Amino acid sequence: MDEDTRAEYESTSQQLRIDLKTWETDWAKSHEGKKPGRGDIKANEDIAAKYKQYNKVRDILSGKISPPSKHAPKSTKRKSDGLSAQTPIKQNKHIETPAKNRTQNHDEDLMNTPAISRKLFSPTSVTSVGPTPQRDGQVLGLFDLLVEKELGTPSKKDSATKTGSARKVDATPSKRSAATDDDEDERLGRTPMSSSKRQRLDHFLTPLKNKDGNKDAATPSSVSKLQFDTPAFLKRNTLPVLEENGDFDAPAPLRLPRKPFARGLSEIVASLRKVEEESLDDDLDALRDIEDGGMGEPKPKTLFPSKPKDDILVDDNEARQLPLGGFDDEGVYDSPVEGDNPTRVYKKKGQKRTTRMAKMRPVRVNRPENMAANPQSDVENDEIQAGGEDAGSDFDDIVEKKPAQKKEGTVKKAARKVNELAHANFQRLKLRNHGAKGGPGINSRFRRRK
């Protein structure tokens, strides 16, 4: 918006604002100092129009609405014609059957540009898939359709084409020649044969001599005219003509992708590390000079420095702290296994053990001295003691003590005998999750077969 237009809109807005303020002041005086509401503004059509115009001008100045053009475009809406006074005349439709054009000149089709080839080979977008073209139950290919439709299929023999004159329906019938009558009578006088019989008999017949061989003689057309070659837009690239007698050229060198000129991050880190190591080596050399000579003359540098002595017998287990972090040199750890730096192979963890492990170890238990009382065992022990190793010796003089007789009393129920040699491995465990996987018949070799 130029300055003149803006100044014009600003003056219009100022004038409208003065008019509206004057009306509001008069309204307030006549209505005890109250401001007019929406209903009061709408009741006065002149003031309502000024309010709308004022808001529109302010929106144009603020840029919310583009200013209207001075030359308003004329509406191109079509105006409806007035109603006609009289009834329109009904249009007569043609009831007669349209005549069929029976004359077909195939020579003109061959001379014109082949439209079928253009349709077949042009890259048009497929809108719908049609039925597969067939003939006598056999699927026709792309080039079969091309040849048939362009050159014409000799399936239907037209008598008008044979004689070379087009039939005229409306013309007066002319008298046929005698030769034509003879051919017609000969054709009608023969007994018709089936196509299979005629085809079988043709193998044994001598072919008739072509009396007029140059009647339909013509220069054979080239393959390019039949549109059998690949169209130009479908050819990928044209190959040069090969010389059969010439020597084979050496194969072109393989172009490998070049490395980028920009330095990689690992290369930058390695170069910075080298710079830091050189500065640290200089500091160490200065410290050694101070320790050795007490700030004396520096030692002359030799052309071939001697190798440091191998005083380190065992490497330090702690990893060396790198100042910048990352790799020591370029190309380290670029591949999974390189040199003496094999990567750690992680083993996939499987399912943990679900049964309780019990290691079977021999348990040494001393037999208790007081075993369960058995009368037979006591008698046997007494007999063994009576006739033992010391029988018949000096100990025979010792008076043998008679065993004390036990008093007969009430028989007590014997407690349940527990063998002390029973091992904990043969105890039944009370597992809380027993049967959680479906009971004893699940995943068992001894379950009942279905």
Curated annotation (Swiss-Prot):
Residues 93-109, 150-160, 199-215, 398-411 have a biased composition (Basic and acidic residues). The keyword Chloroplast does not apply. Residues 59-137, 150-223, 288-413, 428-450 are annotated as: Disordered. The gene is SLD2. This is DNA replication regulator SLD2. Gene3D superfamilies: 1.10.10.1460. Has a role in the initiation of DNA replication. Required at S-phase checkpoint. GO terms for molecular function: DNA replication origin binding; single-stranded DNA binding. One of its GO terms (biological process) is double-strand break repair via break-induced replication. It is found in: Cytoplasm; Nucleus. Residues 122-131 have a biased composition (Polar residues). One of its GO terms (cellular component) is cytoplasm. It comes from the Eukaryota. Keywords: Cell cycle, Cytoplasm, DNA replication, Nucleus. Pfam families: Drc1-Sld2. It comes from Gibberella zeae (strain ATCC MYA-4620 / CBS 123657 / FGSC 9075 / NRRL 31084 / PH-1) (Wheat head blight fungus). Its main location: cytoplasm. Belongs to the SLD2 family. InterPro entries: DNA_rep_checkpnt_protein, Sld2. Residues 345-364 have a biased composition (Basic residues).
